[in-house]
């Protein structure tokens, strides 16, 4: 559960930093895409290196898609523990938004003054 939250937080935070004009690390779209993709690969690698492979998508929208795909296949028994992906992915994403808005952007604005 902790891995889902941390993974979602890291992915969301880096995505926010690379999609906002003032906080981008590079203006080149290829480098921006590389940063976001490398973040996702690193998070998945981190999740698998913990010894517990959860199969978490680390993305709340992907977790929702996974839930609906399983549900439409009429396999409701496999959705018993899907709440872990929903709740902790969303908590991690909300934590990343708070960190980005309340800490990172203010620190970036102070450093640019």
What are these regions (language model features)?
Residues 1-113:
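Membrane-interface helix-loop junctions and terminal tails of multi-pass membrane proteins
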